[in-house]
């Protein structure tokens, strides 16, 4: 084994060991990740996918959501992505945990391999991989699985794209297309777009320098740039072919879903990255903490109107990375301007509504169905880590200019932290902090204490890095590398723990006690979780202000989409991922228009049409808090009110013609009808009586034994209509 290979083996082993130690409790199954979409969406929906497959069907259709919704065509489910299939292991919980954790290792190892292919030596590549795989942006993706699954393959995609552009070989073309194709199989659009932008820009960069390296006029660079971009286009075509199983149905689904409609600009610009987040690259807790003992202490929530917290929890990749990036600005290495251009593009997109650019894209019809601009910070962070790793490699070679520039930056930022830490001894700090973040006196107490601690830690962090850089010429190189690695690990570990807190395993594997009020056989009915719509009402504000108990409230109240984990079917729920079919959206809009009409029993008719037997509403907060003795993790925030047991399949006893959705709402809000009424856009008729003797459903089929008595009947099926449904009567197709 060569020395270089030995160093690589050691580096890979340590990277794997560090990741395993950081997430050991998740690996062993004693705890699990729970933040945000993990609890409310991914853990339950992956169970649905697993159950459908294990029952011998292809997951075309998900009966649990909104009266039925496409599954395989919706990229949110990652049906065709190979690592999703880990959920088919005998233990679902183990498979679910592994299909998240494996991407941490892929990100770490892929980044290390990319840096090594760029002639960065093992120590610098190791620290660069740590800064990426255990950095703030990448670990923020753990609760955003489609983005995590795409971003994990970004380093390997770039590795083989770069190799091909430098020395074209079919093998590298194939591997670049394959790894990009894996991103298409996941189908997360913004991450795929960022990958495409990154490799496309790199192709232009390589073409430009192909002419410059031969001292040719700039006009010779144009054909070089275009030829390389053409190769990227060919790779993209090949990658789309790899991901065609997901891309073709996804594109088809878009036309029939919420994504076919223009989003309001307020939704498109939501979660725009605030300018203040730049400071997070130096001071990781400048804006607050995502989780301390399962409580969010994010004092800059006002910078995210309507959201209260960031989409990307942190952009911090380590103080060493930031210092080396700043040093690169001063020493102006080859590729430095290219990285600055990438950063400028990335930041312009990530700032979203804070600049006129997003408004321009929106009005031009380009950015009308893409949400949350903060996602686009990935390009900048990725490029910065690559450049910083190269600068570290030069520093280890004894480049004094880089060391001095980094030393100066660290000294300046440490002095700022020191001055602020000293100001904490004066009464002005509390007033200024509260004024800056808009905090009232009652809310500022614990936050102020945290903020004071953060600035002291920032002072210590900066002091340690300053000492490391100052001691560099005075220490043996291997000792300095070990100390630098320990510093980076110590710097990033608290962030990794804070961004991904855990819950005990029984949080997911146990069942909420409220389920005891529901029948054991849950196939014949659906639930309408009305309470989930009232996030700004007083009961919701009280229940969701219970600190460390907030996610227990979600779990114990079986808030959507958690009911599907307990074999419950939902209807009239919120479309969280904006992928619901258009008839579902129209029906939900009609339900809320009906409520706004002032009708007292507004929910009765929609529940009858939807086969909903139970309606979830909030319990009064104060009596429930008293009942559990203040231990809100034991609270049952929701009570399910049992209504009439409306069937899923029935014959209408009354038919009414409507012109459109608004006419439907008007008639419901002013009239009184049978619970078996049918509203149709075709001419109405007096339907004959009919009987549904029995019905049987699988994931993709429904078989009914029905009888129409004495004439032409009208069978109502409470299932979301879709263009690919096929209906037969006695074996004969019907329109």
Label each PLM-derived region with a short phrase.
Residues 721-735:
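Extended, hydrophilic extramembrane loops/domains of integral membrane proteins
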Residues 2-725:
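Conserved luminal/periplasmic juxtamembrane motif of membrane-embedded glycan-processing enzymes
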């Amino acid at each position: 084994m060569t020395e270089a290979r030995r160093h690589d083996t050691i580096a890979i082993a340590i990277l794997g060991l560090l990741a395993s130690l950081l997430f050991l409790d998740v690996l062993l199954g004693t705890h699990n990740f729970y933040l945000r979409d993990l609890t409310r969406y991914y853990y339950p929906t992956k169970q649905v996918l697993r159950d459908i497959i294990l029952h011998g069907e292809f997951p075309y259709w998900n009966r649990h959501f909104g009266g039925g919704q496409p599954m395989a065509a919706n990229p949110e489910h990652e049906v065709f992505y190979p690592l999703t299939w880990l959920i088919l292991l005998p233990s679902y919980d183990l498979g679910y945990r592994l299909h998240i954790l494996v991407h941490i290792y892929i990100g770490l190892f892929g980044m290390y391999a990319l840096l090594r292919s760029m002639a960065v030596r093992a120590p610098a590549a190791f620290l660069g991989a740590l800064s990426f795989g255990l950095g703030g942006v990448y670990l923020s993706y753990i609760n955003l699985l489609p983005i995590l699954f795409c971003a994990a393959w970004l380093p390997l995609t770039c590795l083989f794209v770069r190799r091909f552009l430098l020395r074209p070989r079919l093998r590298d073309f194939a591997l670049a297309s394959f790894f990009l194709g894996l991103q298409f199989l996941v189908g997360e659009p913004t991450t795929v777009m960022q990958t495409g932008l990154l490799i496309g820009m790199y192709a232009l960069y390589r073409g430009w320098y192909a002419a410059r390296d031969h001292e040719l006029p700039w006009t010779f660079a144009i054909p070089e740039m275009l030829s390389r971009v053409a190769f990227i286009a060919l790779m993209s075509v090949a990658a789309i072919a790899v991901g065609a199983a997901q891309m073709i149905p996804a594109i088809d689904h878009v036309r029939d879903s919420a994504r076919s409609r223009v989003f309001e600009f307020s939704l498109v610009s939501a979660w725009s990255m605030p300018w203040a987040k730049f400071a997070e690259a130096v001071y990781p807790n400048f804006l607050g903490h995502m989780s301390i003992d399962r409580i969010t202490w994010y004092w800059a929530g006002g910078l995210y109107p309507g959201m209260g917290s960031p989409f990307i929890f942190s952009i911090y990749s380590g103080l060493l990375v930031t210092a080396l990036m700043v040093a690169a600005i001063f020493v102006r290495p080859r590729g430095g301007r290219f990285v600055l251009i990438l950063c400028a593009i990335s930041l312009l997109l990530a700032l979203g509504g804070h600049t006129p650019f997003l408004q321009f894209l929106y009005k031009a019809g380009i950015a009308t169905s893409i949400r949350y601009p903060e996602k686009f910070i990935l390009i900048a962070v990725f490029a910065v880590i690559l450049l910083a790793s190269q600068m570290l490699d030069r520093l280890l070679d004894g480049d004094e200019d880089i060391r001095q520039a980094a030393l100066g930056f660290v000294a300046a930022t440490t002095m700022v932290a020191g001055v602020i830490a000293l100001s904490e001894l004066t009464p002005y700090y509390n007033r200024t902090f509260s004024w800056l973040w808009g905090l009232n006196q009652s809310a500022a107490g614990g936050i102020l204490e945290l903020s004071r601690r953060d600035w002291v830690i920032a002072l210590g962090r900066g002091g340690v890095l300053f000492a490391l850089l100052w001691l560099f010429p005075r220490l043996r190189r291997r000792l300095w590398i070990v100390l630098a690695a320990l510093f980076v690990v110590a710097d990033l570990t608290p962030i990794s723990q804070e961004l991904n807190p855990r819950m005990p395993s029984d949080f997911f594997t146990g069942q909420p006690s409220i389920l005891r009020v529901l029948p054991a056989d849950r196939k014949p009915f659906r639930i309408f979780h009305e309470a989930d719509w009232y996030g700004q009402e007083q009961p919701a504000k009280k229940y969701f202000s219970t600190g460390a108990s907030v996610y227990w409230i979600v779990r114990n109240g079986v808030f959507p989409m958690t009911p599907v984990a307990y074999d419950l079917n939902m209807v009239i729920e919120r479309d969280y991922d904006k992928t619901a079919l258009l008839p579902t959206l129209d029906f939900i809009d009609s339900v809320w228009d009906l409520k706004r009409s002032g009708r007292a029993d507004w929910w009765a008719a929609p529940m009858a049409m939807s086969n909903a037997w139970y309606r979830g509403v909030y319990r009064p907060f104060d009596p429930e808090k008293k009942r559990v003795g203040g231990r809100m993790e034991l609270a049952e925030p929701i009570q399910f009110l049992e209504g009439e047991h409306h069937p899923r399949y029935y014959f209408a006893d009354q038919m009414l013609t409507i012109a459109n959705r608004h006419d439907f709402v008007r008639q419901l809000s002013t009239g009184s009808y049978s619970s078996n009424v049918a509203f149709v856009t075709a001419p109405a008729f007096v339907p004959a009586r009919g009987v549904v003797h029995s019905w049987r459903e699988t994931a993709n089929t429904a078989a009914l034994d029905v009888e129409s008595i004495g004439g032409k009947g009208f069978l109502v099926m409470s299932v979301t209509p879709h263009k690919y449904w096929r209906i037969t009567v006695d074996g004969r197709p019907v329109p």
